Protein backbone atom coordinates (compact mmCIF):
# COMPACT_ATOMS: atom_id res chain seq x y z
CA UNK A 1 0.00 0.00 0.00
CA UNK A 2 1.28 3.43 -0.92
CA UNK A 3 0.66 6.12 1.72
CA UNK A 4 0.86 9.77 0.67
CA UNK A 5 0.33 13.07 2.44
CA UNK A 6 -1.58 15.81 0.63
CA UNK A 7 -2.75 19.27 1.57
CA UNK A 8 -5.96 21.01 0.50
CA UNK A 9 -5.97 21.82 -3.23
CA UNK A 10 -3.35 19.16 -3.98
CA UNK A 11 -4.02 16.00 -5.96
CA UNK A 12 -2.81 12.53 -6.81
CA UNK A 13 -2.75 11.01 -10.30
CA UNK A 14 -3.33 7.31 -10.83
CA UNK A 15 -2.25 6.18 -14.26
CA UNK A 16 -3.14 8.87 -16.79
CA UNK A 17 -6.91 8.86 -16.37
CA UNK A 18 -7.68 9.04 -12.63
CA UNK A 19 -7.12 12.08 -10.43
CA UNK A 20 -7.93 12.38 -6.73
CA UNK A 21 -8.05 15.95 -5.44
CA UNK A 22 -8.17 17.09 -1.82
CA UNK A 23 -10.83 19.80 -1.68
CA UNK A 24 -11.15 20.50 2.02
CA UNK A 25 -9.71 19.29 5.30
CA UNK A 26 -11.73 19.68 8.48
CA UNK A 27 -11.10 18.48 12.01
CA UNK A 28 -12.37 14.92 11.46
CA UNK A 29 -13.00 14.64 7.73
CA UNK A 30 -11.44 15.16 4.33
CA UNK A 31 -13.49 16.13 1.28
CA UNK A 32 -12.10 14.63 -1.92
CA UNK A 33 -13.00 14.76 -5.60
CA UNK A 34 -12.31 11.88 -7.95
CA UNK A 35 -12.05 12.28 -11.73
CA UNK A 36 -12.17 8.95 -13.52
CA UNK A 37 -13.62 7.42 -16.68
CA UNK A 38 -17.30 6.46 -16.43
CA UNK A 39 -16.47 2.75 -16.67
CA UNK A 40 -14.54 2.94 -13.36
CA UNK A 41 -16.87 2.24 -10.44
CA UNK A 42 -16.23 4.45 -7.43
CA UNK A 43 -18.03 3.53 -4.21
CA UNK A 44 -17.65 4.38 -0.55
CA UNK A 45 -16.32 1.27 1.19
CA UNK A 46 -19.39 0.92 3.45
CA UNK A 47 -21.65 0.90 0.36
CA UNK A 48 -19.37 -1.60 -1.37
CA UNK A 49 -19.54 -3.88 1.69
CA UNK A 50 -23.36 -3.75 1.70
CA UNK A 51 -23.50 -4.62 -2.01
CA UNK A 52 -21.04 -7.48 -1.48
CA UNK A 53 -23.14 -8.93 1.36
CA UNK A 54 -26.36 -8.63 -0.66
CA UNK A 55 -24.67 -10.42 -3.57
CA UNK A 56 -23.61 -13.25 -1.24
CA UNK A 57 -27.18 -13.57 0.05
CA UNK A 58 -28.48 -13.63 -3.51
CA UNK A 59 -26.07 -16.41 -4.48
CA UNK A 60 -27.10 -18.50 -1.47
CA UNK A 61 -30.78 -17.92 -2.29
CA UNK A 62 -30.17 -18.93 -5.92
CA UNK A 63 -28.47 -22.15 -4.78
CA UNK A 64 -31.40 -22.90 -2.49
CA UNK A 65 -33.89 -22.26 -5.31
CA UNK A 66 -31.94 -24.49 -7.69
CA UNK A 67 -32.08 -27.29 -5.11
CA UNK A 68 -35.87 -26.84 -4.78
CA UNK A 69 -36.35 -26.84 -8.55
CA UNK A 70 -34.27 -30.01 -8.87
CA UNK A 71 -36.43 -31.72 -6.24
CA UNK A 72 -39.57 -30.70 -8.13
CA UNK A 73 -38.09 -31.88 -11.41
CA UNK A 74 -37.12 -35.22 -9.84
CA UNK A 75 -40.62 -35.59 -8.37
CA UNK A 76 -42.39 -34.99 -11.69
CA UNK A 77 -39.90 -37.08 -13.67
CA UNK A 78 -40.98 -40.29 -11.94
Curated annotation (Swiss-Prot):
UniProt xrefs under SUPFAM superfamilies: CsrA-like
Superkingdom classification of source: Bacteria
Location, primary (coarse class): cytoplasm
Keywords assigned: Bacterial flagellum biogenesis, Cytoplasm, Repressor, RNA-binding, Translation regulation
Gene Ontology MF terms in the entry: mRNA 5'-UTR binding
Disulphide connectivity of cysteines: none
UniProt-listed Gene3D superfamilies: Translational regulator CsrA (2.60.40.4380)
InterPro entries per UniProt: CsrA (IPR003751), CsrA_sf (IPR036107)
Compartment annotation: Cytoplasm
Keyword Hydrolase: no
GO biological process: bacterial-type flagellum organization; mRNA catabolic process; negative regulation of translational initiation; regulation of bacterial-type flagellum assembly; regulation of carbohydrate metabolic process
GO cellular component: cytosol
NCBIfam families xrefs: csrA (TIGR00202), PRK01712.1 (NF002469)
Assembly and interaction partners: Homodimer; the beta-strands of each monomer intercalate to form a hydrophobic core, while the alpha-helices form wings that extend away from the core.
Family affiliation: Belongs to the CsrA/RsmA family.
Primary role: A translational regulator that binds mRNA to regulate translation initiation and/or mRNA stability. Usually binds in the 5'-UTR at or near the Shine-Dalgarno sequence preventing ribosome-binding, thus repressing translation. Its main target seems to be the major flagellin gene, while its function is anatagonized by FliW.
Name of the protein in its database record: Translational regulator CsrA
Organism: Borrelia duttonii (strain Ly)
